[in-house]
């Protein structure tokens, strides 16, 4: 019975999953039905649309109803016809004709205004022509357009009258003067100036010749006269020229006066434009008469018609007299409703809460309002269902793991019970000092009385400090596994929630659970999420995170040594932790988990290599030496990548080739073989990397060259890898000078062999500059500046932001530092040039081999330097490495039978391995 009482409430609290599927189905069904009904409605929603629908007879009158809501608003409904009746088509044609008539009248009015303006321009142009040509206007005048009768309308003629202005120097006067023109220079100059001015008047906009051929001919005459005025021409030659020009002008004048296409002065722009507008007016008048005839005919058919226009009831004649602009805007709505009829036909519509108008009062039948409960149901049901769904989801979240709302403040720490933790110190390698620090904790958990009997106090808290991936969490689990005690694990971010007080409640609950399972270990990973400095946040020291931290401080200082609870925490940001959290009595011991050295990396690789099938020839010590700065997680990932690469190549064991490739992938990035590099780019990269390798092999204090490659990885097009022989604990001056020469080797090789330099040495120059600046300003290795530290770096601020660089020396000292910096870099570059000049043959050979093989290992580089290089041996070695541990397919087909065919030949097959 006790078991039933315990389990039945849990079964009642669990909500059936089928309910949620049913809930989603109901919501989907309601929305679908609403969309179905709304999609079948016609697009009528405003009362002003009804004027056009009623005028064009598009609605069924018997189904047009309205329901009064108050004195101003009504709801109306109706249905469209299946086809437009004949009367509706006649009505629409009538409205369209009225709109066309208004448009024609407007265009005709604009054309008439244009004719008035152009007629004035024509008179001015012809009068000006008569004045400059000396040709008098006839008494009857020049007729540009005759009187024209178009139906009942008349277009008045355009006749130009006017006397000639005798004061203007004209063509006729110059023709008379040239007959008795003296041949003196002054007389010729005066006559030429008058002729030049006359030709300019022919080209003036006042005349406005529109023919391009005539204008070009007149411009040529203008240029000839201008040349005669600027050049020295004999008298007879000048007179002959002027006579020719006058004859040409006379001919042009006669051509302008001569009728063309039935019109004089047709070559003038103003006359041509006038004729175009005149013809346009004639055309518009004819269209107006035709439209008026059609309107009269349709008006006879619609004598009894009633039109609803802007809330007015009008006859057909009254509709025609409406303002054209107002009618045009109103007719746009009629056109839209007429065009929409094809999609609205046979459909019903309903529009609620619309203002009353005349068409509703006259044509729609009134009815009493009826309640639509189904409409209310469809309207509010989706809202109710969504609110219910949100309520149930929220209630399930609040219930948490234990099925009650009060469990929201319970600790989410995961308990690894006694006997379940299989991790021991045997699984931890490379951090021996940290393991030694934690041996006492293991002894306490196994035998607490050993320490308390002597009056000693066991550390209440242990803080593991180290970079990411160094094994802080792993060593904490190893402590619990070695002592075989319960292990509570939780992340620092699990304490902070959106509800106030939840974090502090979880802290209290976690320590209560730990006391019940004492002796045990509580491990808080990434404690900096909850243990940051107080008072630095936006909440001014009173936010939820700080309340959680306060509760943690109280709990850590509140339990005694006899309770057997040890708190372990891990962080990679000890600088941001609150000082009260770090004081003795809370975290008594700080264990620094450093990045492993060469020996540590070898031990870590050996631990992870136990579960990987490695080729016995794989040198784990060489891998450890080639991965400086790698954490335990990096090394584990390296071996895992090597195993994946070997499996991809169908090998039965992981060889040194896969390990080296995985190391490069983890540390430097994946090969970018898809990057297109032309032959010149490959050659440049090969010279650059060969320069690094040659200088590195020739200097005394450089690490051995491990590999040279021109395969792009990450952001680099190539790389030269060095294999450190020992841990780098300090830097020596001679070593740094050699390292600077190695860094400058790539740029020096480009300068010597290519005669130019590229941007590929950007990282080399930046790294060399950083080293030299540290030598001068931090390590006191400059002969000129002495053993003085010129750079200061501040400690990290309490807010958690990084340190900053402070300059505390004068501008003159800065100049000396810059000069010394340039001197050392120039010396390193010159040293690299000297080394490469003395090993040109080896560098050229290494470059050629890099272009062919793309990668050279340490053995290849040594053979090139020893002049014992053999490319065939390299190819054979690469082929042997490629076939090493290759899987042999078990599904090979049997060999084909050797049967003779009719022509006496045997069947032969190509085989490949």
Swiss-Prot record:
<comment type="subunit">
    <text>Homohexamer.</text>
</comment>
<feature type="topological domain" description="Cytoplasmic">
    <location>
        <begin position="395"/>
        <end position="913"/>
    </location>
</feature>
<comment type="similarity">
    <text>In the central section; belongs to the AAA ATPase family.</text>
</comment>
<dbReference type="GO" id="GO:0004222">
    <property type="term" value="F:metalloendopeptidase activity"/>
</dbReference>
<dbReference type="InterPro" id="IPR005936">
    <property type="entry name" value="FtsH"/>
</dbReference>
<dbReference type="InterPro" id="IPR003959">
    <property type="entry name" value="ATPase_AAA_core"/>
</dbReference>
<dbReference type="InterPro" id="IPR003960">
    <property type="entry name" value="ATPase_AAA_CS"/>
</dbReference>
<feature type="binding site">
    <location>
        <begin position="466"/>
        <end position="473"/>
    </location>
    <ligand>
        <name>ATP</name>
    </ligand>
</feature>
<dbReference type="InterPro" id="IPR000642">
    <property type="entry name" value="Peptidase_M41"/>
</dbReference>
<comment type="function">
    <text>Acts as a processive, ATP-dependent zinc metallopeptidase for both cytoplasmic and membrane proteins. Plays a role in the quality control of integral membrane proteins.</text>
</comment>
<keyword id="KW-0479">Metal-binding</keyword>
<dbReference type="InterPro" id="IPR027417">
    <property type="entry name" value="P-loop_NTPase"/>
</dbReference>
<dbReference type="Pfam" id="PF01434">
    <property type="entry name" value="Peptidase_M41"/>
</dbReference>
<feature type="region of interest" description="Disordered">
    <location>
        <begin position="887"/>
        <end position="913"/>
    </location>
</feature>
<feature type="binding site">
    <location>
        <position position="692"/>
    </location>
    <ligand>
        <name>Zn(2+)</name>
    </ligand>
</feature>
<dbReference type="InterPro" id="IPR037219">
    <property type="entry name" value="Peptidase_M41-like"/>
</dbReference>
<keyword id="KW-0862">Zinc</keyword>
<protein>
    <recommendedName>
        <fullName>ATP-dependent zinc metalloprotease FtsH</fullName>
        <ecNumber>3.4.24.-</ecNumber>
    </recommendedName>
</protein>
<feature type="active site">
    <location>
        <position position="689"/>
    </location>
</feature>
<keyword id="KW-0378">Hydrolase</keyword>
<dbReference type="InterPro" id="IPR003593">
    <property type="entry name" value="AAA+_ATPase"/>
</dbReference>
<dbReference type="GO" id="GO:0030163">
    <property type="term" value="P:protein catabolic process"/>
</dbReference>
<feature type="region of interest" description="Unknown">
    <location>
        <begin position="1"/>
        <end position="100"/>
    </location>
</feature>
<feature type="binding site">
    <location>
        <position position="688"/>
    </location>
    <ligand>
        <name>Zn(2+)</name>
    </ligand>
</feature>
<dbReference type="GO" id="GO:0008270">
    <property type="term" value="F:zinc ion binding"/>
</dbReference>
<keyword id="KW-1003">Cell membrane</keyword>
<dbReference type="InterPro" id="IPR041569">
    <property type="entry name" value="AAA_lid_3"/>
</dbReference>
<dbReference type="Pfam" id="PF17862">
    <property type="entry name" value="AAA_lid_3"/>
</dbReference>
<feature type="binding site">
    <location>
        <position position="764"/>
    </location>
    <ligand>
        <name>Zn(2+)</name>
    </ligand>
</feature>
<feature type="compositionally biased region" description="Polar residues">
    <location>
        <begin position="899"/>
        <end position="913"/>
    </location>
</feature>
<keyword id="KW-0547">Nucleotide-binding</keyword>
<dbReference type="GO" id="GO:0006508">
    <property type="term" value="P:proteolysis"/>
</dbReference>
<comment type="similarity">
    <text>In the C-terminal section; belongs to the peptidase M41 family.</text>
</comment>
<keyword id="KW-1133">Transmembrane helix</keyword>
<keyword id="KW-0472">Membrane</keyword>
<keyword id="KW-0812">Transmembrane</keyword>
<dbReference type="Pfam" id="PF00004">
    <property type="entry name" value="AAA"/>
</dbReference>
<keyword id="KW-0997">Cell inner membrane</keyword>
<feature type="topological domain" description="Cytoplasmic">
    <location>
        <begin position="1"/>
        <end position="16"/>
    </location>
</feature>
<feature type="region of interest" description="ATP-dependent zinc metalloprotease FtsH">
    <location>
        <begin position="101"/>
        <end position="913"/>
    </location>
</feature>
<keyword id="KW-0645">Protease</keyword>
<dbReference type="GO" id="GO:0005886">
    <property type="term" value="C:plasma membrane"/>
</dbReference>
